[in-house]
Design a protein with these regions (language model features):
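A short N-terminal helical cap/helix-turn-helix that marks the beginning
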Residues: 53-68, 84-108, 127
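Conserved pre-ATP/AMP-binding loop-to-beta segment of ANL
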Residues: 103-106, 222-231, 238-261, 268
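Structural core segment of the AMP-binding/adenylate-forming
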Residues: 54-58, 138, 162, 166-235
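Conserved AMP-binding/adenylate-forming core of the ANL superfamily
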Residues: 104-162, 179-184, 235-238
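Short acidic-glycine-tyrosine-enriched beta hairpin
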Residues: 2-9
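Conserved AMP-binding A3 loop
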Residues: 118-123, 257-281
Length: 282
């Protein structure tokens, strides 16, 4: 209400918005416990500028296929309904859609451990994930197969993850701190067929220790340095087509998307599964 006062710790990220359709001015007052003057905080005059509400036809968004919003006469949302969720697939309906309509839009700014900067657009993400989907398919990976990803913060994680989303294989992200017995348990419990692993540290060593006791494991892919007995992900996946078409059998809605293992604090880790609608809620 007009005249209300709110005290808060400004070191915590925050924001303020006006609702109800009326113009509003916010006054921010910094309370300085030392009592000393702060020249940078001299009173400044603020002239509010009226913002014009844009209609859906002026600024269409990919969300309109999935969400209906009712608003009041002042443009304030009053009701939200979701639709078509049974068909939703994040890789096709968000990543690829933006890749087609806004190809140069930045999807991710990645800074590697050696300070190499990569600016990855949605067009890049669309094409590289398609290459991954085609690559994985060539290895015999299919819809419903389980694939473990131990990739730390490598940018290849996102190419592989979205490629698996398109293919319909179930991604199982895992920590690079797992030891051989942890890996063996997860592979056998989830019947994992493929593992994509970083060459950093001793992760691949731990996988190789576990592999002989894991009959379901067929493919081992390494990201980074080459390793005997492993397929070279960085070298092989770029050879494949950057186009991957959606089909009537492509994963969607209630199909499985992800599996995570719990921490196992009170017993053996358990599988928590998520469907494609999970990413829709984000």
């Amino acid at each position: 209400n007009p005249g209300d006062t709110c005290y808060f710790d400004s070191s915590i990220p925050h924001g303020m918005i006006a609702v109800g359709g009326e113009d509003c001015e916010f006054y921010a007052i910094v309370l300085n416990p030392t009592g000393a003057s702060i020249p940078e905080l001299d009173p400044m005059r603020y002239t509010p500028v009226a913002r014009e509400m844009k209609s859906k036809t002026e600024r269409p968004g990919i969300w309109q296929k999935w969400i209906d919003i009712e608003t009041s006469g002042t443009g304030t949302p009053t009701k939200i309904e979701f639709k078509n969720t049974e068909n939703f697939n994040f890789a096709f309906d968000v990543v690829d859609e933006i890749g087609k309509t806004q190809p140069e839009k930045l999807a991710m700014l990645h800074l590697s451990s050696d300070k190499t900067e990569r600016r990855i657009t949605f067009a890049d993400m669309m094409k590289e994930s398609a290459r991954c989907a085609n690559y994985f398919s060539s290895l015999g990976i299919k819809k419903g197969d389980r694939v473990m990803l131990i990739l730390k913060r490598h940018y290849q994680f996102w190419y592989a993850m979205i490629g698996l989303n398109k293919l319909g294989a179930i991604a199982i992200p895992a920590s690079n701190q797992l030891l051989s017995h942890d890996i063996e348990y997860r592979i056998n419990t989830a019947e994992i067929s493929t593992i994509i692993c970083t060459s950093d540290g001793e992760c691949a060593d731990e996988v190789d220790k576990a592999a002989p006791s894991c009959p379901s494991l067929v493919n081992k892919l390494i990201v980074g340095k080459k390793r005997e007995g492993w397929r070279d992900f960085n070298e092989e996946y770029p050879r494949f087509s950057s186009s991957y078409k959606r089909s009537k059998d492509s994963p969607k809605g209630d199909d499985l998307l992800l599996m995570f293992f719990t921490s196992g604090t009170s017993g053996y880790p358990k599988i928590v599964a998520y469907i494609h609608k999970y990413s829709f809620l984000h």
